[in-house]
Amino acid sequence: MAKILGIDLGTTNSCVAVMEGGEAVVIPNAEGSRTTPSVVGFSKKGEKLVGQVAKRQAISNPDNTVYSIKRHMGEANYKVTLNGKDYTPQEISAMILQKLKADAEAYLGETIKQAVITVPAYFNDSQRQATKDAGAIAGLEVLRIINEPTAASLAYGLDKGDIDQKILVYDLGGGTFDVSILELGGGVFEVKSTSGDTHLGGDDFDQRVIDYLLAEFKKSEGIDLSKDKAVLQRLKDAAEKAKIELSGVANTNINLPFLTVGTDGEPKHMDIDLTRAQFQKMTEDLLEKTLVSMRRALSDAKLTPNDLDKVILVGGATRMPAVVELVENFTGKKPYKNINPDEAVAIGAAIQAGVLGGEVKDVLLLDVTPLTLGIETLGGIATPLIQRNTTIPTKKSQIFSTAADNQPSVEIHVLQGERGIASENKTLGRFILDGIPPAPRGIPQIEVTFDIDANGILHVSAKDLGTGKQQSISIQKPGGLSDDEIERMVKDAEMHAEEDRKRKEEVEIRNNAEALINAAEKTIKEAGDLATEDQKSKVNAAIEDLKKALEGKDAEDIKAKTEALQESVYPISTAMYQKAQQAQQAAGGEGGAAGTDARGPDETVVDADYEVVDDEKRK
């Protein structure tokens, strides 16, 4: 049965896992790491870079590198320009997903077509649909979108499903924060409530350090560095490193030599100490925001901290001591430590993929919608149909009527949010139901139905009960992608994949050619009288032809000239191999061995060189 991936598409890092032998296993990327930086860039030669390679070149190439694109998912008009071309957040996210997919395929040795992808619990409809679009562009059928804290609870509780317990999942990632309250028991994972902030995460803690460094440098040197992209990239890396170091030590030093040049032409260096106490002071308001969300989630679930059986921390930012201390003080419980905060979400997604694929039995996941859904009614009021923290999938209907006599049509304005005034909530979509027969206001009966699927994505319909006329909309949201746009982006992504494949193939052809030239030159040198002058002349001519081809860009020409060189050198290498064999067979004792030592080892080396094994590895 085809494998279904579980993917944690993170703000800072992403992770992919799969079910193998009844267990969820994290798949390492091509570089050998278990997580992949969610960074996309283009090199100065126009080559697409994703992951660690993109992150490494960011300091020298900040204009063509993008971080934290997840923070802009679902934004209508947001674009980033890389290598002279505009990309939507969905397209950038698709590049990350393509990298994860390709690495998983290489690891598993099979083609992957389906995935379960996680999103922050507090992602709205627009952001969820954008995530599905990104999966489609990457060539993945997204079977399910699930919430990150819920996925983490699956990772924690798959082997504890028979124990009734209430757990709090505190998920502080690179760019988003969620807290969810769940009840586990009898194989059922039921989300009772969720709260959070889609623009609060480790990036914000880093930014506080960056702001501090900028202010300190301006104070000491009188230079404003805030407009220099290359410098800001160095500061970003230094701030992230300092944050991580302060999780283990009480103070750290930020030393960045040759950061800029002063008005006197002299280089300026940064050398600033930062203590854990200073760091915690400058970020305490960020932690306070997470406390507000924890209180709200418990209140919505009608629980107190004393009712909790377990507290789970998820996301790399939860390694900060201040986070652990805050959660422990609030809940009165030491957080559960036997779970990797960077991998738990991907593992949970893989378990859900196993449920959908029939590999994992007796597990039922009951998630909730994070925000209230409703429509605008008379006077600009937001009238809710589905309250936040309602278990999904769900379907709710309500009867509305006209606001004026003989009103021929009604506009259904679909909203998401907690405010009582329509304009203060997020618009998900609008559509018109027309053809209503003339009647006094309040007489026509318009049934509005909201239907949320298991991915948390909304479908809305309106029906005139008098005429039976109906209109419906699958919320595509502002900034959503039409099927045609997704199709175009899929083709564009496939085209880039083909370009990447060709570029890689061309590099391999060049590497093979250069390695063969080295091996052939050594073979000629070592052959001695085993090669005729005519044979040597042919090999030398083939070497020159191949070197000339390497000066150009015609890969097929290089390939053909490589094959020609292989053919010309083959008789010589064969003769050398046979000579080496004969010498080995003739060695009958110490004297015989001494007589062949001078030539035998050399011939062995030449033969190995001709196979080009070592040279290819070096390339």
UniProtKB/Swiss-Prot annotation:
Keywords carried by this UniProt record: ATP-binding, Chaperone, Nucleotide-binding
Chain residue ranges for the region called Disordered: 580-619
GO MF terms held by the record: ATP binding; ATP-dependent protein folding chaperone; unfolded protein binding
Domain of life: Archaea
Segments traversing the membrane: none
Annotated Acidic residues bias: 604-619
Keyword Nucleotide-binding: yes
InterPro entries from the UniProt entry: ATPase_NBD, Chaperone_DnaK, Heat_shock_70_CS, HSP70_C_sf, HSP70_peptide-bd_sf, Hsp_70_fam
A Pfam family per the record: HSP70
Function of the protein: Acts as a chaperone.
Protein name: Chaperone protein DnaK
Native organism: Methanosarcina mazei
Gene name, Swiss-Prot/TrEMBL: dnaK
